[in-house]
From Swiss-Prot:
This is Probable septum site-determining protein MinC. Pfam families: MinC_C, MinC_N. Belongs to the MinC family. Cell division inhibitor that blocks the formation of polar Z ring septums. Rapidly oscillates between the poles of the cell to destabilize FtsZ filaments that have formed before they mature into polar Z rings. Prevents FtsZ polymerization. Coiled coil: none annotated. It comes from the Bacteria. The lineage of its organism: Bacteria, Pseudomonadati, Pseudomonadota, Betaproteobacteria, Burkholderiales. GO terms for biological process: cell morphogenesis; division septum assembly; regulation of cell division; regulation of cell septum assembly.
Length: 270
C-alpha cells in the first residue's frame, strides 16, 4: 500500500468540539418534560448543535432507550453523534447504532446552568466545585474522534497569544481563540465568540460568549453593553430565558464564576 498522500482525501486523528447531554434519570417522561421546559422559550440556542449522549450518571442497573433520547434531541434540533458510557455500559449503549466516544474531562467539577446571577461588588473569585447539569460545554478534546492519548501537560504552559478582532460579527459567524479574545465591534444576535481564556468585548454583546471552554474556571467575560443570547464560563451558562437584572442589562459588566455560579457585576468605569 502506498504511503503517499492522496490529493483527494486524508484520514487523520482528530477531535470534535461538542456538548454533552448528560442523562441523569431513566424516567423518559421526566426527561422529555424537562427538555420542553428548558427549550420551549428559547428554541434557537442549541439549534443544529451536535451532542454526545452521556449515560455515565445512570446507576449500574439502569438502561435507557437511546433511540428515544435521540428522537427527543431531534425534536429540539440537536443532533446526537455518539454515546459516552462506562465500560460496563458499552454493550447496551452501542445497541442504538451510535458510536461510542471517549470523554476526557479537563477538570473534575462538572458544569451546571446558572439559574441565578447575583449582582454585587467585585470580590476575588472563589474555587469552583459543585454539581453537574443537563448540559456541559465540552472543550475541543472532550468528545474523542480517534485522537491518540494526550501526553501530560507541562507544569507551566506557554500562554497563547491574545486574538484581536476589529470588525463586527454578524449572525452565523464564530470566532475561536486559544488564549484571550478581544472584540472591538458588536457581536450580533446569532454570532458566537469562544475563548479558552478571557473575553473582552468593547461593543454590544447580543450573541453568545463562551469563555474558559477548556474548563478554566478563572476565565472572565468583560463587555461594555450586555444584551446576550447566552453567556458561559467553563461550561456554566445562562440564557435569556432567565432575564438579566436591570442594573446589568445593557450596561458595562464583568462576568465571573464563584462557587459554580455566574456572577454578573457592573463595571465601575468612572
Amino acid at each position: 500500500m502506498s504511503l503517499k498522500k492522496s490529493p483527494f482525501f486524508e484520514l487523520r486523528s482528530g477531535s470534535v468540539d461538542t456538548l454533552l447531554f448528560i442523562v441523569k434519570t431513566a424516567d423518559l417522561d421526566a426527561l422529555r418534560a424537562e427538555l420542553v421546559k428548558r427549550f420551549e422559550a428559547t428554541p434557537e440556542f442549541f439549534a443544529d448543535d451536535v451532542v454526545a449522549i452521556d449515560v455515565r450518571r445512570l446507576a449500574g442497573h439502569e438502561r435507557v432507550p437511546l433511540d428515544d433520547i435521540r428522537g427527543m434531541l431531534n425534536d429540539v434540533r440537536m443532533r446526537a453523534i455518539g454515546v459516552v458510557a462506562q465500560p460496563e455500559q458499552h454493550a447496551w449503549a452501542a445497541s442504538a447504532g451510535l458510536p461510542l466516544l471517549e470523554a476526557r474531562d479537563r477538570r473534575a467539577p462538572s458544569s451546571k446552568a446558572a439559574d441565578e446571577a447575583p449582582v454585587q461588588q467585585a470580590e476575588p473569585a472563589a474555587p469552583a466545585a459543585g454539581q453537574a447539569a443537563l448540559f456541559e460545554q465540552a472543550g475541543p478534546t472532550l468528545a474523542d474522534a480517534g485522537a491518540p492519548p494526550e501526553s501530560p501537560a507541562p507544569a507551566v504552559a506557554a500562554q497563547s497569544a491574545t486574538l484581536v478582532v476589529d470588525r463586527p460579527l454578524r449572525s452565523g459567524q464564530q470566532i475561536y481563540a486559544k488564549g484571550d479574545l478581544v472584540v472591538l465591534g458588536p457581536v450580533s444576535y446569532g454570532a458566537e465568540v469562544i475563548a479558552e481564556g478571557n473575553i473582552h468585548i468593547y461593543a454590544p454583546l447580543r450573541g453568545r460568549a463562551l469563555a474558559g471552554v477548556h474548563g478554566n474556571h478563572d476565565a472572565r467575560i468583560f463587555c461594555t453593553c450586555l444584551e446576550p443570547e447566552l453567556i458561559s464560563i467553563a461550561g456554566i451558562y445562562r440564557t435569556t430565558e432567565n432575564p438579566l437584572p436591570a442594573d446589568v442589562l445593557g450596561k458595562s459588566v464583568q462576568i465571573r464564576l464563584e462557587q459554580e455560579k455566574l456572577m454578573i457585576e457592573p463595571l465601575r468605569l468612572t
